[in-house]
């Protein structure tokens, strides 16, 4: 499917060059990772693992611990 809205996908490094800051890793919890924008000081949350993969991973880990 063609991108009809003409969005450009940029990496964090490219975005840092455009806005004058960079994203610094803060922490990860579950399928989410938090970054801090060094220019604005705002904390940004990105989902870095899809929900289904994370859920199945948690279930598999629990089953593995239960039956070991």
From Swiss-Prot:
Annotated keywords: Antibiotic, Antimicrobial, Bacteriocin, Plasmid, Secreted
Record InterPro entries: Bacteriocin_IId (IPR007464), Bacteriocin_signal_seq (IPR010133)
Principal subcellular localisation of the protein: secreted
Organism: Lactococcus lactis subsp. cremoris (Streptococcus cremoris)
Biological process according to GO: defense response to bacterium; killing of cells of another organism
Claim: Transcription regulation is one of the keywords in the record: no
Function: Kills Lactococci by dissipating the membrane potential of the cells.
Domain of life: Bacteria
Propeptide, residue positions: 1-21
Compartmental location: Secreted
Protein name: Bacteriocin lactococcin-B
GO CC terms: extracellular region
């Amino acid at each position: 499917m063609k991108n009809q809205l003409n969005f450009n996908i940029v990496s964090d490094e490219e975005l840092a060059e455009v806005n004058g800051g960079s994203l610094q890793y803060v922490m990860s919890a579950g399928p989410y990772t938090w970054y801090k924008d060094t220019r604005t000081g705002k904390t940004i949350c990105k989902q870095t693992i899809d929900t289904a993969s994370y859920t199945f991973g948690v279930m598999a880990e629990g089953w593995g611990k239960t039956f070991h």
